[in-house]
Amino acid sequence: MTEILINGNFLCRNLTGIERFAWEICKRIDSLLNSSDRVSMLVPANASNIPSYAHIAVVRSDKEIHGFSAWDLGVFAKACRSRNACALSFSNTAPFGKTCGIAFIHDVYAKVFPNDFKSLYDKLIGAYSRLNYYNICKNARLICTVSNFSKKQIMDYYGVAEEKIRVIYNGFEHIHTVNADESILEKIELRGRKFYFTLGSLSLRKNLQWIMKHAELYPNELFVISGAMLKNVVPSELEKIKLLKNIILAGYLSDGEVKTLMQNCKAFVFPSYFEGFGIPPLEALACGAPIIVSNAASLPEIYGSCAHYIDPFKPNVDLEALLAEPVSSPVPLFEKYSFDNSAKKLYEILKEIGR
């Protein structure tokens, strides 16, 4: 088998959906490997939390990662060439040209909504993202993505042949390994109170505006928002949110704190207008919470009849009435969207490419 070299850049990033996917899939791929498989991972020198694998060979680089271009186009690309290995990249980035290998594009957000990138810094991030989409679509041996919605967008925007793209779904199993941390209920004074919960990095597509405008219209409803602040959230919006007494900005929370809020909320609200998959509502369902999600992008494909739907641009919605409407059991979703199943699918791809 040709060596597969995994891009360990995700080990130096905050744990959002893309990084979660990489962590969970690599852990399960490791359990599927046998002695004839050659799979390694190149890890930056400044990665602090390095996984322990039984079969994936962890190669520690002496170079740190401080910019994706320097790592992906330099250190990682050079390692792929010197080892004659096929690259496997999970994070929407990959080496340029013939060393691109197998690469994941989780979504093409920067291509579809370029105007969401407001500041000069964000415009550079958007341009770099689009450059990576183009490189992967042109040069990858195989493209993986996380929904049929994203697959179609890759085909439509970049003219990629359908047979060059494989859909490998996200999963939810990790939430069951997390110990709930109920101290968060006292920390932000939620014990005994009814509230809606939303989770996600506070980028424009997560649609913080919907929550803000809805909270203004329904002052008796309480919302808890968790997520790290990003540069492309308009500061004036955040200042206005801080003035609303029925919104709690909880900041970045631990997995245990998030699990507790999912277990105790009236519903998990996810008004994002663009998602390649959207893991948080699946986590919430696994915690027993009803979910209210946007009717846009991949979300109807992923959640089907198991979710309550809202228009991401119309915040005047009676959520109590919406929650009274019947939805289907989420059990079929747990059977369909599984990291275990997705790892098996990716392993078959690696064997196919590595022959």
Segments and roles (model prediction):
Residues 1-355:
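Carbohydrate transferase catalytic cores enriched for Leloir-type hexosyltransferases
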